[in-house]
């Protein structure tokens, strides 16, 4: 499908020279698959050809910040499938939310202990943090009191993996700096819920349209009745779905590029849908059969490869012609 291009392909580093006036919080010893700096994302910039990006699981992102007394949209680390290891450079208070991983702290004075998720944890210089691969879910969020510093691009520090815009992915040897944000009294409201695990069947609510009528009635039945597997090629741009029987279009016309939203389910010529995530292209040239209900977007962010998805209709199709 078409992608609206932009000249704003800028990259900033969390260990940039511009950050040297900020206190160093951590040194990165290991990153696992991917560690990104994310905040609430970029809003009101679609006209520039720039997507939202931002934390995929917004509720876990906000929860992590509130636990340590940060403003709810302060920058955090988004950790994909565990593996993060950090060395503490100066005393800090952290919280880790999201996927059900084991959080291990090796205290300089007292040795290795398992710590609780969704709770504030005080750390001293020389301590080490390690996050295991999740048993449930896919992404964790690590907030530190005072926030994480990175340079903003178009009002956000978030990394957009499609446009390569924003703070570059964290690498071994990087230093994480404090944003020195004002903090607030902590209110512990634990909103952690059970996360999907490999083998689970996940029900996702969708609204039909805008191009549902481009598909045959049999294909629409298949869309709801089949169980869709998540491909290992899925990423922050989109979940690639596959099933035994592909969806068949009833209208074979060329579709002009049109705007797409996070959660849009686009169907390319092979009939195997792609569910757009936060880093999706602003426009698409394939028909969108349905879109995920907003309240299930956080759930989508936590579904690991090996789960099955089944879609559930919550609204009727309305032809807006």
What positions do the PLM features span?
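Conserved "landmark" site that anchors the functional core of diverse proteins
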Residues: 1, 6-321
């Amino acid at each position: 499908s078409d992608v609206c291009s932009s000249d704003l392909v800028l990259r900033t580093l969390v260990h940039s020279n511009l950050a040297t006036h900020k206190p160093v919080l951590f040194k990165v010893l290991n990153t696992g698959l991917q560690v990104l700096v994310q905040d609430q994302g970029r809003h009101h910039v679609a006209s520039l050809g720039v997507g939202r990006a931002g934390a995929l699981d917004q509720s876990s992102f906000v929860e992590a910040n509130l636990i340590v007394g940060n403003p709810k949209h302060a920058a955090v680390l988004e950790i994909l499938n565990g593996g993060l290891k950090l060395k503490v450079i100066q005393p800090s208070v952290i919280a880790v939310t999201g996927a059900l991983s084991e959080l291990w702290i090796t205290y300089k004075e007292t040795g290795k202990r398992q710590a609780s998720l969704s709770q504030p944890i005080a750390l001293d210089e020389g301590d080490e943090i390690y996050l295991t691969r999740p048993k449930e879910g896919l992404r964790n969020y690590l907030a530190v009191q005072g926030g994480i510093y990175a340079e903003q691009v178009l009002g956000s520090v978030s990394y957009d993996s499609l446009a390569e815009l924003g703070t570059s992915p964290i690498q071994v040897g990087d230093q994480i700096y404090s944003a020195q944000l004002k903090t607030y009294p902590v209110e512990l409201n634990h909103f952690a819920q059970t996360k999907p695990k490999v083998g689970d069947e996940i029900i996702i609510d969708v609204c039909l349209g805008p191009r549902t009528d481009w598909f045959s009635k049999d294909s629409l039945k298949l869309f709801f009745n089949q169980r869709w597997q998540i491909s290992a090629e899925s990423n922050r741009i989109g979940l690639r779905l596959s099933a035994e029987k592909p969806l068949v279009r009833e209208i074979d016309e060329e579709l002009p590029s049109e705007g797409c939203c996070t959660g849009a389910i686009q169907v390319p010529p092979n009939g195997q849908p792609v569910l757009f995530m936060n880093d999706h292209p602003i426009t698409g040239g394939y028909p969108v059969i349905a879109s995920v209900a907003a309240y299930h977007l956080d759930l989508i962010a936590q579904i690991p490869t090996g789960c099955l998805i089944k879609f559930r209709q919550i609204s009727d199709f309305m032809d807006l012609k």
